[in-house]
From Swiss-Prot:
Intracellular or extracellular location(s): Mitochondrion
Role noted for this protein: Associates with the EF-Tu.GDP complex and induces the exchange of GDP to GTP. It remains bound to the aminoacyl-tRNA.EF-Tu.GTP complex up to the GTP hydrolysis stage on the ribosome.
GO molecular function: translation elongation factor activity
Biological processes per GO annotation: mitochondrial translational elongation
Gene name per UniProt: TSF1-2
Key words of the record: Elongation factor, Mitochondrion, Protein biosynthesis, Transit peptide
Similarity section: Belongs to the EF-Ts family.
Name this protein carries in UniProt: Elongation factor Ts, mitochondrial 2
């Protein structure tokens, strides 16, 4: 008897479970909502339809959301979407960190029905991911121009590749992500156009050549790479001492400042071409415009004259090279939301 009493004191009775205790609906709803952006009522419905299993409830919610998005997309398919934003991304600028690299950039216009949705953060995030996708999957073009239109069909069928959330990559195509956003905001979401500029680095046998891409937008909301007006400009640099110049941090800073000013110039003026046709003066010609968007000395010159002076001041050009060396704008693209394509 003493042994029994000792045993009962030394080893107090505990209740053993063969399975984990059941969790309350409130606890499960809290856990589900931490993983999915749904209301308490929606979370409860999902759990009750999924045997109170959070993993199954997540799948149930995804299925319901997809079905709802498909219905909404079909309902708004015939509507007009002329609002939206233009997004730009530069994955590789051509000159970076003191060396020549390749060029990889893109510009995309994503449309919706109202300015209200265009200012929605979800819309901005989707545009950022689509623009990154276009730049990432594009291949160098064997064409006369560097900037090339990107196929809408190819882009819509491509897996959405996010630069900020790589864990989400491959879970949906671009078109599926657009449809999902329609389900969330209730408006038609459509792609109007996209272009990319992709060029592999120049080889070591071409040490005197480099490219530099400049991106700029105007009227941005959430993201400084998105706005109602967007532009990409491609510059060429040529000099026998280019490698030496690029290695200088001062030169890199000056080049950044120049590119930013050129982007503002293209957007801020009615720029339609780079040079005027021979024997004429075109107000839309970039090189003939006063370089008002450059902050600093020399902005009273035309853009063309300024670029020549800029190259000379940085010893990219000497008297024997004036016709072939320096810095030059090769191409540019300028878009405004809702343009007729």
């Amino acid at each position: 008897m003493l042994a029994a009493r000792f045993a009962s004191r030394a080893f107090p009775r505990t209740r053993l479970y063969s399975t984990a205790p059941k969790r309350s609906l409130k606890e499960l709803v809290t856990e589900l909502r931490s993983q999915a952006d749904v209301s308490p009522i929606q979370a409860g419905q999902a759990l009750k339809a999924s045997d109170m299993d959070v993993s199954k409830a997540l799948l149930w919610l995804e299925k319901q959301r997809t079905q709802s998005a498909v219905k909404k997309a079909a309902k708004v398919a015939d509507r007009t979407a002329n609002e939206g934003l233009i997004g730009t991304t530069v994955l590789s600028s051509g000159v970076a960190n003191g060396r020549r690299v390749g060029v990889r950039a893109a510009m995309v216009e994503l449309n919706c029905e109202t300015d209200f949705v265009a200012r929605n953060e979800l819309f901005a995030n989707l545009l950022e991911d689509i623009t990154h996708t276009a730049a990432f999957i594009s291949e160098p073009a064997n064409a006369e121009t560097f900037m090339q239109p990107f196929s809408m069909e190819t882009l819509q069928n491509a897996p959405l590749l996010s630069q900020t959330k790589p864990s989400q990559n491959g879970k949906a195509t671009v078109s599926e992500a657009m449809r999902d956003l329609t389900g969330r905001v209730g408006e038609k979401i459509s792609l109007r156009r996209a272009l990319t500029v992709v060029r592999d680095p120049f080889t070591s046998s071409q040490p005197d050549l480099a490219l530099r891409v400049a991106a700029r937008v105007h009227q941005s909301v959430f993201n400084p790479t998105q706005g109602r007006i967007g532009s990409l400009a491609l510059l060429a640099l040529k000099s026998k001492r280019l490698s030496e110049a690029i290695a200088s941090q001062t030169f890199q800073d000056d080049l950044d400042k120049l590119c930013q000013a050129l982007g503002r110039q293209v957007i801020g003026f009615p720029t339609t071409c780079i040079r005027s046709p021979p024997g004429t003066t075109d107000e839309g010609a970039l090189y003939d415009q006063p370089f008002s968007m450059f902050i600093g000395p020399g902005n009273d010159q035309s853009v063309g004259a300024f670029l020549q002076s800029w190259a000379q001041e940085r010893s990219l050009v000497n008297k024997d090279e004036e016709q072939s060396a320096g810095v030059e704008v090769l191409e540019f693209a300028k878009w405004t939301v809702g343009d007729v394509v």
